[in-house]
């Protein structure tokens, strides 16, 4: 099965972007509660 590079990149972004967003949101909340 040949992997479509653009499709692979799109799915990678589709997974990474929400994950990074959630991690940043969690860190902001944690640092806010720590103060």
Curated annotation (Swiss-Prot):
Membrane-spanning ranges = 7-27
Q: Which InterPro entries match?
A: PSII_PsbM, PSII_PsbM_sf
Entry keyword Cell inner membrane = no
Q: Does the keyword Membrane apply?
A: yes
Q: Where in the cell is it found?
A: Cellular thylakoid membrane
Signal sequence extent: none
* Membrane-topology annotation of the record: Single-pass membrane protein
Q: Name one GO cellular component term.
A: photosystem II
What keywords does the record list, in alphabetical order? Membrane, Photosynthesis, Photosystem II, Reaction center, Thylakoid, Transmembrane, Transmembrane helix
Report the main location listed first in the record: membrane
Top-rank lineage group of the source organism: Bacteria
Q: Which GO terms describe its biological process?
A: photosynthesis, light reaction
Task: Report the sequence similarity comment from the record.
Answer: Belongs to the PsbM family.
* Subunit organization: PSII is composed of 1 copy each of membrane proteins PsbA, PsbB, PsbC, PsbD, PsbE, PsbF, PsbH, PsbI, PsbJ, PsbK, PsbL, PsbM, PsbT, PsbX, PsbY, PsbZ, Psb30/Ycf12, peripheral proteins PsbO, CyanoQ (PsbQ), PsbU, PsbV and a large number of cofactors. It forms dimeric complexes.
Function statement: One of the components of the core complex of photosystem II (PSII). PSII is a light-driven water:plastoquinone oxidoreductase that uses light energy to abstract electrons from H(2)O, generating O(2) and a proton gradient subsequently used for ATP formation. It consists of a core antenna complex that captures photons, and an electron transfer chain that converts photonic excitation into a charge separation. This subunit is found at the monomer-monomer interface.
Q: What is this protein called?
A: Photosystem II reaction center protein M
- Gene (UniProt): psbM
